[in-house]
Amino acid sequence: MKSITLVGSTGSIGTQTLDIVSQYPDQFRIVGLAAGSNVEMLAEQIRQFRPQIAAISAAEKLPALQAAIKDLDPQPILLGGEAGVIEVARYGDAETVVTGIVGCAGLLPTIAAIEAGKDIALANKETLIAGGPVVLPLVEKHGVKLLPADSEHSAIFQCLQGVPKGGLRKILLTASGGAFRDWDVERLAEVTVADALKHPNWSMGRKITVDSATLMNKGLEVIEAHFLFGLDYQDIEIVIHPQSIIHSLIELQDTSVLAQLGWPDMRLPLLYALSWPERIYTDWEPLNLVKAGNLTFREPDHQKYPCMQLAYAAGRAGGSMPAVLNAANEQVVALFLDEKIKFLDIPRCIELVCDRHQNDNCANPSLDDILAADQWARQEVLTATKNLASQPQIISVN
């Protein structure tokens, strides 16, 4: 039985991970839980899964959590604040830590888990996007496994099983196209928050659903794929695949192409990350290609999706620039969800912030450099949102 700590337990990734654990009680057990601010849901999870330790990032809500489970016996260790989440991530009894926290907030807990010798089921792409220059050397130093738990990188990882070293030629990341794949570019000026949250295929959290609508999610995945699989950016391509049945593909040196297929269900990559290298039987609905029907592909529209180009440019710049891109995107999407800026302001603001960082880009950033760049970018967004009157030039991927 594998012992698991789940960081980000009340979010979309967290609840689906717990669904898997509840289906396979003879395979997995929860020893640690950490969440952001949802006291009620975390208390319910503690009651059901009986972890040894739990934390809530919103420290002011710790007394409410303590009160909500005061009748439990035995009592888990309860902690509050970011430091509490980090303690949960490094807790001794866990073999694998699932990182399901959204955004750069997952970086420090992931590093703590790696330094404690835990294998990582990585569902938090920002850990590598912002912290790749720091995280990958730590993974090697501590001899832990870094297993992708999002659908696209899990698909690539699965396709690579049995491929000899040097056999990989190209990665093709598939994208649904998000909520606006069938909209004309001219209509994007009318986008509301409700429009952006209508993903055609996947059920996800609010932030990642907006990222899917801008295709920044796919741009961030390009950077993550670069760190995970070691390919140059010119060898990582994005293709629009509206059905979300093929989760990604790899091209080998002899031009053979391998793909991983399945219904759009995050539980499958999560289960594989938890069970690897084993394959566990499930009673989930198998893929029926006749039922799925046509599988279609098209090139992404760079005019409609400028965030894609910004991500490629940041990835190629390297250093601390991906951390700035990621932080700016997180902050701008939060402003959009609060209806403080328009949808089309998202790429404009991100580009302004990245442009301002060019002269300060740190080529070989330390963890402190990355955290400083992250904080700088978030503050810079507030300035950039005041300077959106003129349409900027979009950075080219070429």
From Swiss-Prot:
The keyword Chaperone does not apply. One of its GO terms (biological process) is isopentenyl diphosphate biosynthetic process, methylerythritol 4-phosphate pathway involved in terpenoid biosynthetic process. GO terms for molecular function: 1-deoxy-D-xylulose-5-phosphate reductoisomerase activity; manganese ion binding; NADPH binding. Coiled coil: none annotated. Mn(2+) binds at D150, E152, E221. Its cofactor is Mg(2+); Mn(2+). Pathway: Isoprenoid biosynthesis; isopentenyl diphosphate biosynthesis via DXP pathway; isopentenyl diphosphate from 1-deoxy-D-xylulose 5-phosphate: step 1/6. Keywords: Isoprene biosynthesis, Manganese, Metal-binding, NADP, Oxidoreductase. It catalyses: 2-C-methyl-D-erythritol 4-phosphate + NADP(+) = 1-deoxy-D-xylulose 5-phosphate + NADPH + H(+). Pfam families: DXP_redisom_C, DXP_reductoisom, DXPR_C. Its EC number is 1.1.1.267. 1-deoxy-D-xylulose 5-phosphate binds at K125, S151, E152, S176, H199, S212, N217, K218, E221. It is an enzyme of class 1 (oxidoreductase). InterPro entries: DXP_reductoisomerase, DXP_reductoisomerase_C, DXP_reductoisomerase_N, DXPR_C, DXPR_C_sf, NAD(P)-bd_dom_sf. NADPH binds at T10, G11, S12, I13, G36, N38, N124, E126, G205. Belongs to the DXR family. PANTHER family: 1-DEOXY-D-XYLULOSE 5-PHOSPHATE REDUCTOISOMERASE, 1-DEOXY-D-XYLULOSE 5-PHOSPHATE REDUCTOISOMERASE, CHLOROPLASTIC. Catalyzes the NADPH-dependent rearrangement and reduction of 1-deoxy-D-xylulose-5-phosphate (DXP) to 2-C-methyl-D-erythritol 4-phosphate (MEP). This is 1-deoxy-D-xylulose 5-phosphate reductoisomerase. It comes from Trichormus variabilis (strain ATCC 29413 / PCC 7937) (Anabaena variabilis). The gene is dxr.
